[in-house]
Regions:
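Metallo-beta-lactamase
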Residues: 1-79
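C-terminal regulatory/interaction regions
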Residues: 79-132
């Protein structure tokens, strides 16, 4: 059987947090695209991640990761556009953009994970900023 060792790129459960400033979303997406080529070619059937159980459906899991990242990026992009339309608060400092994006995009996620979500949002904002 063709097993792909993915380390932390693809996990046995959940998804990887690409945390700014060390995590580079461009490099991460490029890695996922390379994994996608390997799984689509049939050279890898299952995944042995650095954490969690073996993943029997390598191709489906990599597709899920890519789709999840695309969805999150679109959610972050939409949140930024919405936030740009909001007026400046009267008499107060405007909160950090990343915090405000987290409140919108990760509203359904327990607040305990918001610090990690914030680092992920910072990586996504950096990525979107480089795209222009």
């Amino acid at each position: 059987e063709q097993v792909l060792l993915t380390g932390d790129t693809v996990l046995g459960r959940g998804t990887t947090v690409v945390a700014y400033p060390d995590g580079d979303l461009t490099a991460y997406l490029e890695s996922l695209e390379r994994l996608q080529r390997l799984t689509r070619s049939g050279r890898a059937a299952s995944i042995a991640p650095g954490h969690g159980p073996v993943v029997p459906d390598a191709a489906g899991t990599v597709e899920h990761y890519l789709r999840h990242r695309a969805e999150r990026l679109e959610q972050v992009r939409a949140a930024v556009l919405e936030l740009e339309q909001e007026p400046e608060p009267v008499g107060g400092l405007r909160r950090d953009l990343a915090d405000r994006v987290v409140e919108r995009v990760y509203a359904d996620v327990p607040r305990e994970v918001w610090p990690a979500a914030r680092l992920s949002v910072l990586a996504q904002l950096d990525y979107l900023g480089r795209l222009g």
